[in-house]
Amino acid sequence: MFKLALTLTLCLAGSLSLAQHNPHWWGNRNTIVHLFEWKWSDIAQECENFLGPRGFAGVQVSPVNENIISAGRPWWERYQPISYKLTTRSGNEEEFGDMVRRCNDVGVRIYVDVLLNHMSGDFDGVAVGTAGTEAEPGKKSFPGVPYSAQDFHPTCEITDWNDRFQVQQCELVGLKDLDQSSDWVRSKPIEFLDHLIELGVAGFRVDAAKHMASEDLEYIYSSLSNLNIDHGFPHNARPFIFQEVIDHGHETVSRDEYKDLGAVTEFRFSEEIGNAFRGNNALKWLQSWGTGWGFLPSGQALTFVDNHDNQRDAGAVLNYKSPKQYKMATAFHLAYPYGISRVMSSFAFDDHDTPPPQDAQERIISPEFDEDGACVNGWICEHRWRQIYAMVGFKNAVRDTEITGWWDNGDNQISFCRGNKGFLAINNNLYDLSQDLNTCLPQGTYCDVISGSLIDGSCTGKSVTVNEHGYGYIHIGSDDFDGVLALHVDAKV
């Protein structure tokens, strides 16, 4: 009887973790966008006016719970919580709930960035949060939850990243480290996450997951409610979980400890794709991209070119400030069938602490758009760049097809097909790509969705004529604005 009970328990745990890898996308949609620091009302409008019509699958939103108010309002104050009240500079609970429903109604799922590891770091005296709650972080006193000193690990600093105890029980950059082995501490985030599920979210990005023991997270995840069927989710659907675990391949706390609980952020993807498109690694080697590079299995990997943290760091990671390479890398990311894809939507920054666009009263301002739909008032909105949203459409069009017809010039010019539905070519050399290449597409003329759009049967950019054998003449000049060309069956002239 004991063996039977144990078997049933293990099967249930396995099925729950497997379910937590499902992002619950509509139809053939399969790209998430991180609308970093956007207001809830603006996200609702963006779902209805742009993301839904353009085929985006979901939005990762900034933390929703009350945070400390820091001088100058740097972006990272959102990662210093003092309660679980749903009031931030992005809006209140009513506005959040309205946004979730409106986005779900147009097939765009919402994933919340959640902070389970810690509360706010030290603050001189009494801190007041975005909902008006008072706390004394220096005393580990957070009455808005409530948490007190006994709910936290003893104060210590992480000085050795190869020491598991320090990584998981000391304070990450001074943030007060919660003791998730405590039943009381576990109960509060479970209540918080369940409330968000009730409001209709599809899942969670778990910040600083590697700083929490995997067994504690497993308990929290398995205790959560199923998704809300009133928002279009099937019965018994589990929240999609993706966890921030920075693992460069030599970490004491490994991504492998978390991959069965949900997806894991594959930071090596970001670093290596940046290396390649910065010219530090030949593109020809990308033929084996994915697990061939030591990355996680595709269904367990949350993939990205950059995120809100590493786009601010020096190094190989690409960001909007290198637009040609960034667009090429993003095109490859969305065209190659590996991982659960997320694209970044940033605001302009000059230094690490730059706040989101705000007015004189330090209120976040809404994005404004020019006649082409691009953002103009401090918001970068990479997701509105044609070269990126067009690749979201490409990814939708070629879903469930494999890589075929790989070609390269032995260096930094590559092309490949996605079944007989799509074709991508990239030129990262300092000379032109001019070649008859196998596109694998049915005979006809196709619009290059990178350089233009198919409007009323006409292409506003380059077009490629494919012959009866699937071949077409591909030209990407070394000085072309984008360095990439993309064709697919939904853009046939």
Curated annotation (Swiss-Prot):
Give the highest taxon in the source lineage.
Answer: Eukaryota
Reaction equations catalysed: Endohydrolysis of (1->4)-alpha-D-glucosidic linkages in polysaccharides containing three or more (1->4)-alpha-linked D-glucose units
Q: Which organism is it from?
A: Drosophila yakuba
The active site lies at: 207, 244
* Gene Ontology, cellular component aspect: extracellular region
Where, per UniProt, does this protein localize? Answer: Secreted
Q: Which cofactor does it need?
A: Ca(2+); chloride
PANTHER family given in the database record: ALPHA-AMYLASE
Q: Modified residue Pyrrolidone carboxylic acid is at which positions?
A: 20
According to the UniProt record, what happens if one changes residue 198 to D? In strain: LBV2, SA3 and SA4
The disulfides recorded in the entry are 47-103, 156-170, 375-381, 417-440, 447-459
What InterPro entries does its record include?
Answer: A-amylase/branching_C, A-amylase_C, Alpha_amylase, Glyco_hydro_13_cat_dom, Glyco_hydro_b, Glycoside_hydrolase_SF
The alphabetical list of record keywords is: Calcium, Carbohydrate metabolism, Chloride, Disulfide bond, Glycosidase, Hydrolase, Metal-binding, Pyrrolidone carboxylic acid, Secreted, Signal
Site feature: Transition state stabilizer: 309
Record GO biological process: carbohydrate metabolic process
For this protein, the Enzyme Commission number is 3.2.1.1
* Subunit description: Monomer.
Outcome following mutation: residue 401 to A: In strain: SA3
**Which of the seven top EC classes does this enzyme belong to?**
hydrolase
Q: What CDD domains does the entry give?
A: AmyAc_bac_euk_AmyA
Q: Which residues bind chloride?
A: 205, 307, 342
Q: Which positions carry the signal peptide feature in this UniProt record?
A: 1-19
**Which GO MF terms does the UniProt record name?**
4-alpha-glucanotransferase activity; alpha-amylase activity; metal ion binding
Annotated binding of Ca(2+), by residue: 117, 168, 177, 211
Coiled-coil segments = none
Protein name from the UniProt record? Alpha-amylase-related protein
State how the cofactor is bound: Binds 1 Ca(2+) ion per subunit.
